[in-house]
UniProtKB/Swiss-Prot annotation:
Pathway: Lipid metabolism; fatty acid biosynthesis. The lineage of its organism: Eukaryota, Metazoa, Chordata, Craniata, Vertebrata. Its main location: mitochondrion. This is 3-oxoacyl-[acyl-carrier-protein] synthase, mitochondrial. PANTHER family: 3-OXOACYL-[ACYL-CARRIER-PROTEIN] SYNTHASE, MITOCHONDRIAL, POLYKETIDE SYNTHASE-RELATED. Keywords: Acetylation, Acyltransferase, Fatty acid biosynthesis, Fatty acid metabolism, Lipid biosynthesis, Lipid metabolism, Mitochondrion, Transferase, Transit peptide. It catalyses: a fatty acyl-[ACP] + malonyl-[ACP] + H(+) = a 3-oxoacyl-[ACP] + holo-[ACP] + CO2; butanoyl-[ACP] + malonyl-[ACP] + H(+) = 3-oxohexanoyl-[ACP] + holo-[ACP] + CO2; hexanoyl-[ACP] + malonyl-[ACP] + H(+) = 3-oxooctanoyl-[ACP] + holo-[ACP] + CO2; octanoyl-[ACP] + malonyl-[ACP] + H(+) = 3-oxodecanoyl-[ACP] + holo-[ACP] + CO2. One of its GO terms (cellular component) is mitochondrial matrix. One of its GO terms (molecular function) is 3-oxoacyl-[acyl-carrier-protein] synthase activity. The gene is OXSM. It is found in: Mitochondrion. It comes from Homo sapiens. Residues 1-27 form a transit peptide.
Amino acid sequence: MSNCLQNFLKITSTRLLCSRLCQQLRSKRKFFGTVPISRLHRRVVITGIGLVTPLGVGTHLVWDRLIGGESGIVSLVGEEYKSIPCSVAAYVPRGSDEGQFNEQNFVSKSDIKSMSSPTIMAIGAAELAMKDSGWHPQSEADQVATGVAIGMGMIPLEVVSETALNFQTKGYNKVSPFFVPKILVNMAAGQVSIRYKLKGPNHAVSTACTTGAHAVGDSFRFIAHGDADVMVAGGTDSCISPLSLAGFSRARALSTNSDPKLACRPFHPKRDGFVMGEGAAVLVLEEYEHAVQRRARIYAEVLGYGLSGDAGHITAPDPEGEGALRCMAAALKDAGVQPEEISYINAHATSTPLGDAAENKAIKHLFKDHAYALAVSSTKGATGHLLGAAGAVEAAFTTLACYYQKLPPTLNLDCSEPEFDLNYVPLKAQEWKTEKRFIGLTNSFGFGGTNATLCIAGL
């Protein structure tokens, strides 16, 4: 028998063996309550959080303001916004005072010229998260074992429009050599990787409003499956501009309520659209034994990650919430958790009539009678909708809820409709009370029908 034939038979035999093994693993998994595939590998915990949000900059300062019922939504000023139906947004506060964002605290003046605003915000959030975690890899081995996954939902449109205008009116030489790097969605991850010499997986996600959740979930799997020991994961977006607001307004996605304190009101009968926000959130995810060995403070554990697609409409969710239901079910399945073990859901709920209703239906259909024992809240009344950063911000809020055992409120929810009959943590924060482990879900859904759910638990 020739060597070629022998090698061919070996390869064929190996493929058949692998196929049978995969079939056996799949056949042993039920819908809920099985040994999750991720647990056949390694546990993943969260040891650091960095937040750059409309509520401020930091970790515990932002959390305290969230729990205190504060909001970062403000009125838009300037003639350029006068013709746009939406007149509110949620800006990151700029300045040098406590809780304000000063770009020069994180990058040099020359870097500011070569980087976009969302990239700088991501660098700031990453620095805060790594400092919070106490993880600063110095050796080659530690750098190779640490990766980055930071996504961006939208490129900064004003950079494109201003560059196009300069090119058309002033010519080729007025196009910045940094134009292309500024608008690449992977540049936030790339800059963080370069800055800290992180040589593990270098990953960027761009899945609209699900970006941040996908980045955190993908990082969870990178660690669980041994691609890294530590991941610096999150999302960033900073695209509040007349052009982006006009685009979302034309899509009838934004609130037209001119009162910044009432414009974003998830689950409310008079909700009429979301409020655009900006910011970045980065979490340090770490293999459990790695964190224990270096005596890191552990906020929570990531138990599972679910994904789904609506396959329905470019902007509207499935009206029955079928995609959202499958997404949450997939996260429970991955975590090996029963629906009755969940006691909190950080809802995607952006304050749109269709989206909030669909998510509410999905929760009630999946959890059945147990839905009435759940607490469900949306934090977007406080932060606005941070688009590509939203999923990471809300993963951070769910993590902190597990750690402090407090549930962030749904602001502005002073009345409800008959179908919205769950505990939405209205107006004020609540103590998280359960006789079981503190386990929550956080949902993110985006244009194009892209969905993600993370299952996060206290230790």
